């Protein structure tokens, strides 16, 4: 599968490290922006395999210099079957404009969304992902039903070690996670949604795609930093 990244890079060591990882992977970032300042960065600690956020710079240059699409960007985006963004991408201002692209739109609402943020985006995306660990099964189902709208294909709530629940407007789908002794749970949710979307868009049913998402998330929890490329810093 071919993929690319369109974002805003800073001018610090963190930016240089991310760019070197992207280059080594072979990920296209030809439509990214480069600005002077801090790259988006979060500080975390790992406690018995669980990642705990200590703070961040709120997106750094991604927040300070939000992307405005050019005509070349729009033509480029139309090459893709799927465009993924999230609550921390600082691109909500593009949601209306992206209604004109040919591909599906996926959105990660993460775990600290507000009702206002959900309402602002939910009717403009095909796939919505939520991290909701403290809700009961019934509360999750009520939440997904409440927010599902005509535009949506599938909404999914992942819940750590609990059952992931999906909803397509007619039926709920529940899949148990693949439980491994984690090395680092960083980006487990991102891994889930990536695999889910790939399999679902290739024609697999929702349950099969969710199972593949759980399997890939389990594997990513066995890798430091979710995909490696770690460096030491002070």
Name each region found by the language model:
Residues 99-105, 109-174:
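Conserved phosphate/ATP/ADP-binding segment of small-molecule kinases
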Residues 62-72, 86, 108-117, 138:
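Active-site glycine-rich loop that binds ribose-phosphate moieties when present
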Residues 38, 89, 134, 161, ...:
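Flexible, active-site-proximal loop/turn residues at the rims of small-molecule/cofactor binding pockets
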């Amino acid at each position: 599968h071919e993929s690319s990244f369109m974002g805003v890079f800073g001018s610090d060591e963190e930016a240089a490290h991310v760019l070197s990882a992207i280059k080594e992977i072979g990920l296209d970032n030809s439509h990214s922006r480069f600005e002077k300042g801090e790259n988006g960065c979060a500080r975390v600690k790992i406690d018995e395999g669980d990642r705990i956020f200590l703070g961040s710079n709120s997106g750094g240059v991604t927040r300070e210099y939000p992307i405005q699409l050019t005509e070349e960007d729009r033509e480029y985006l139309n090459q893709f079957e799927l465009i993924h963004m999230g609550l921390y991408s600082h691109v909500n201002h593009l949601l209306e404009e992206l209604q004109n692209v040919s591909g599906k739109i996926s959105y990660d609402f993460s775990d600290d969304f507000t009702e206002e943020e959900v309402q602002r985006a939910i009717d403009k995306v095909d796939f919505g992902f939520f991290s909701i660990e403290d809700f009961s099964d019934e509360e999750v189902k009520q939440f997904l039903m409440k927010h599902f709208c005509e535009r949506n294909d599938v909404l999914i709530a992942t819940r750590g070690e609990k059952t992931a629940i999906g909803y397509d407007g007619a039926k709920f789908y529940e899949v148990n996670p693949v439980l491994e002794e984690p090395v680092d749970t960083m980006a487990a949710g991102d891994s889930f949604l990536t695999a889910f979307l790939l399999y679902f868009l290739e024609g697999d049913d929702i349950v099969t795609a969710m199972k593949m998402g759980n399997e890939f998330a389990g594997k990513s929890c066995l890798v430091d930093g979710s995909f490696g490329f770690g460096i030491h810093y002070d």
